Amino acid sequence: MGEVKSVKVDNWGVFFLQKLQNFFNKTDYCDLTLQFRDNSQLKVHRLVLSACTDYFNVLEQTCEIVDDALIMPNEFQADVVVPIVNFMYTGTLEFELKMYGKLLRTAKEMNMTVLLKLLEAHRRTMENVNRQQRPPSPKGIRRRTVGQPSSGLPQQRVLGPSPQSRNVATPIAQRANTQRGSTGNTMSRTSGGSNRSPYGDSSNVKQEPTSPFEQLRKGYNNNKRPAQTSLLSPPSKKPSLEEVKEFAEQQRMRKQIAAEYGDNDPEYDGGMLYDDVHAGDDDDDDMPPQPSTSKQQSPQGTQTQLEHGSTTIILKQDSPSQTPTIIVKDSSNAKLNHTKIIAEVLRQYPHIVKGHKNIKLKIMPNTPAAPTEKSAPATVKPPANQSSATTSPHKKLHVSFKADKSTPLITAQQKAASSQQKSGTSQTTGNQGTGANPPANTAAAQKRRIDSKTMHALIAQGAENTTGPWLCLRCGVNGRPISIPSYRGFRRHLINTHKETIDPALCEHCGWRSVNNRELHFHMYMEHQTKSLLYTFAECALCNQSYRTKGELEAHINEVHTDDNKQQCIYCNKVFEQELQLYRHMKSYHKEQALEDGIIDETDEEFLGSQDEEEEAEGDEEQEPEQTGKVRILSDISLPATSAITVQQAQQEQLQEEDVEQVQQEVKFVGADGNEVELTDEQRKEILSQLNQQQAGATAGGVVMVLSEPEAEHVKQETDEKSLAGTEEEYDDSQIYSELGAADSVESAKKNIADESKESIDNLEWAENLIAESEEQSNKEPKSDKPRDDISEKLKELTGDWTEDENDDDVDDKPATAELASELANKDPEPTVHEEEDDIDLALQSLHKGPEEATEEKASEESVTSADDAVDAVPNINSQPEKMDVDSEAADEKASKAEVQIKKEAELENDQEEFIKEDSPIPHSDSVAELREAVTASEGEDDVHLEADNIRKELLDELIAEAEKPDQEKDIVQSEENATTEALDRSVTDEDDLVPPTQVSTEQMEIDEPAAEKAAENNEDTRTADEKEAVEDKPNQTQDVTTAEKPTLESAKAGDEATSGEAASVDKVKSLISEWGDDDEDEDENGVSAAAKEEL
């Protein structure tokens, strides 16, 4: 055979691992997928996993595989398994310090001895760091103890962890070297026929120096990844050349390691010191072995034994320098409550907290029964309320349990659950001596953990998942779903976030599915106390239990309340405890039927009045907010001026006293537009007094009175009095009449509103026919009731419709009208004559128009008069009786003066007649334009005004035609005109002061008068208004008087023939005007103005 030469690459293992890592990172050639409980997946190579451990081979045979996805058990979390898999590919273990216990436990379950030794080396490093951080304690001598290996057994030295890289345990060759002290455990492995190693036949066990874990990492130069030291690592020393060579030899030995490891240690004891970085973890760890510098002494020392029920606690401490051991023996066969045991230990021995040392705790049952449970070591924190445990924030007691294969122990997660929930339930699994079956986790957090299969089943249920947990995979991160704590929040999340449509048959609170809508509402009412707005459920009056239907309630009554269902309503089958309750129910809900059947009687109210007093009062208070104020249109209401209120003070006081005796009512005055009218107290009293005096047939003026219901106190008082008296309610006669009047006024208001335009047209037609009929009525006897009623109704309509709002609008229009009047006054006498004739037309038209038009005409006349007259009238009601006495004397004096004046001006009048005849159409057009401007400025109704203009034009044409005739009757009527001049001066001035015609007393307005007297009165009003204008216009005195007299004579022609009724009509006009008039500042004691005297 030829010579065989072997050539190898020293770093082939590193290169091979890097290639595998690249495939792993790119998920190339991966033939197995690990799926965890949080739905995260990890793709791996079966060959790599099988080369490191047999655990996954066993797992594939025992666990479920779905589409090449191996469903991992609940105990193996992704955050623990992923670092271990990365370690298999890279040889670097990257983990957080708080994950140490979980990694150690998982490595034991997987039986990965290399990983266990790596973690053990990291623990020793942390132990050394903690010793350096405590200067008072002596520095320990580190020595590495070597076991007795068999021939060809290489000893391993492990590579430390790096925070970034994925880790792998590196086999270490055995070389002869000086021995260094270290506290560690010997790890050996059997190389089952490893022929590849050149050192396989070595018979000498070489001892090598052991350097700190981080120094080994710095000596690892062949790895491409940068090495980073741990934050807790001590200051590293420079590696010596000898250590570098040793590490190179160890690299060559990696490929010589066999696939099977054996743990020859009879008992694996370990412990770990915690700091505040991971002091709160529930990680498991072993107790550290006793330092080898001090020889193990025989169990001597003090033992303290206490009996606590059936549990015996023994504190064993061989020497003061050694860590004490606590042995707990339980003589009972019940499950051990480890929380209570540790709490009792800390209470009995509080001094063990001060030493800050690990303490061995062995829990042993007294019975020699073979144990069937095994658990990993655990650490325990002392309670936070222990005063001795609060000496330092980071110096906490950690009690480690010594693993005893013959005794059942507690797991860390079980300990955490028991310490939090104070429950002694512990569940552990596993067959002793095997690590294939993992222990079950029973902590509170573990109970919420589910595998991926269950998770997908819950997610598929969607809103029908009534048990929880409620998970949403779409909103999760990296394949991990989010958990929503409640079903209601989960349902809202699906609707609002994912726009899903939920079955309406599902309960929105718990997801319970109902058959129909009524059943769903009943479920929500019973289970979630949500009252239904659609359905009412039958309730048992005896036990207050609700039922979905009346049939179920009846069945319940028949079964449960067989002897109690005597008080049952015969109409609705409702059951009551007492007979009185049944009677009230029948009286409230079945009164008509009960009265017909004779079950109840009206006289029974007398006996129930005293019993129901309090309940009815409470019922009235509850029902009172539902009784809102009733709106009733009472009648035609006018707003009085403050000057005329004092006349009726006595009547108002009397009415006020009567109102106080009656039930008090809150009165609100609302206009036609719906807004409340603000009035003074005197105005409110005046309106109320008018309402009491009005007739049922009076027309409505558009003002609404709102009468709210009486207050609860008055209702309660009346109810109490009437119930005690046992009599029915009785009303005052005044209340009955007022209600009847209000009802009639409502009907009349509706009728008048509907026929408002029709009545306006009727008024105009009546005004036209009145002049033609006046001549016939003067020669005949006055006809009886019907003409009188027509005239009185028309007068009421003309004088009643006058509101404050219209006057406000008229006052606003006065400045513009005054400017127009001043311009007309500065012109030639011709415009003056036109203006006077226009005023005459307006005065005539005021008698023939409807209520709205009359108001607008009066406002236009008042505006012109106010511009010419600089003196304001002062109201004086007390002077009215004197005016009435002097009117006759003033009329005689003015008549004599007027005759002389008329004779002097007769020639001038004749000269002006022809001028007036020729220019008569011009004032007609001017008056029409001026009237239209006044109508536009005020509120006005357009349709009615157009008809009024047409009729007024016809009247003007007739007056102009009659003005051409000789004034034969001028002397006859002159005395009557002079007699009323004084009163008309005051009446026009009162119109400037906005004194409404409604101040005329009701008795005077109701007096029946002949039709002839009414016609004469209207004509005299027109003539006196014209005479007023003639007297006040000084520059054109003569022309004003003559032009005003001619149309006036023609309009009053019919009234002059009725000589028998003239005296009565003059007195009537005086009585009407005396109440309107106010005294001017220039009037004398007889009520005659200075301007009138000067003209006369």
Curated annotation (Swiss-Prot):
Please give the function described in this protein's UniProt entry.
Plays a central role in chromatin domain organization and boundary function through recruitment by a range of insulator DNA-binding proteins, including ZIPIC, pita, CTCF, su(Hw), cliff and others. Together with pita and CTCF cooperatively binds to and regulates the activity of the Miscadastral pigmentation (MCP) insulator. Cooperatively recruited to the front-ultraabdominal (Fub) boundary by pita, su(Hw) and cliff. Recruitment of Cp190 together with Chro/chromator induces chromatin decondensation.
From the Swiss-Prot or TrEMBL record, state where the protein is found.
Nucleus; Cytoplasm, Cytoskeleton; Cytoplasm, Cytoskeleton, Microtubule organizing center, Centrosome; Chromosome
Could you tell me which residues carry Phosphothreonine?
T229, T603, T727, T817, T936
Q: Where is this region: Disordered?
A: 126-308, 366-449, 608-630, 710-733, 770-927, 960-1096
Locations of Acidic residues compositional bias?
608-625, 802-812, 1076-1086
Task: Give the modified residues of type Phosphoserine.
Answer: 197, 211, 233, 298, 319, 610, 708, 723, 745, 748, 757, 760, 920, 925, 927, 938, 1071, 1074
Task: Kindly state one GO CC term assigned in the UniProt record.
Answer: centrosome
Gene name as annotated: Cp190
Residue spans with biased composition (Polar residues)? 175-213, 220-230
Q: Where is this region: Involved in microtubule and centrosome binding?
A: 1-209
Q: What is this protein called?
A: Centrosome-associated zinc finger protein Cp190
Q: Does the keyword field hold Iron-sulfur?
A: no
BP GO annotations: chromatin looping; heterochromatin boundary formation; nuclear axial expansion; regulation of cytoskeleton organization; regulation of DNA-templated transcription; regulation of transcription by RNA polymerase II
Zinc finger intervals, C2H2-type: 538-561, 567-590
What keyword terms does UniProt attach to this protein?
Chromatin regulator, Chromosome, Cytoplasm, Cytoskeleton, DNA-binding, Metal-binding, Microtubule, Nucleus, Phosphoprotein, Repeat, Transcription, Transcription regulation, Zinc, Zinc-finger
Superkingdom of the source species: Eukaryota
Q: How does it assemble?
A: Homodimerizes via the N-terminal BTB domain. Component of the gypsy chromatin insulator complex, composed of Cp190, mod(mdg4) and su(Hw). The gypsy chromatin insulator complex interacts with Topors via mod(mdg4) and su(Hw). Interacts with Cp60. Interacts with inv. Interacts with Nup98. Interacts (via BTB domain) with pita (via region between the ZAD domain and the first zinc finger domain); the interaction is direct. Interacts with ZIPIC (via region between the ZAD domain and the first zinc finger domain); the interaction is direct.
Q: In which tissues is it expressed?
A: Expressed in spermatids but not in mature spermatozoa. Localizes within the spermatids to a sheath of microtubules around the nucleus and to microtubules within the tail.
* Annotated PROSITE patterns: BTB, ZINC_FINGER_C2H2_1, ZINC_FINGER_C2H2_2
Tell me the CDD domains matching this sequence: BTB_POZ_CP190-like
InterPro entries (alphabetical):
BTB/POZ_dom, SKP1/BTB/POZ_sf, Znf_C2H2_sf, Znf_C2H2_type
Its lineage opens with:
Eukaryota, Metazoa, Ecdysozoa, Arthropoda, Hexapoda
Q: Which GO terms describe its molecular function?
A: chromatin binding; chromatin insulator sequence binding; DNA binding; DNA-binding transcription factor activity, RNA polymerase II-specific; identical protein binding; microtubule binding; POZ domain binding; protein homodimerization activity
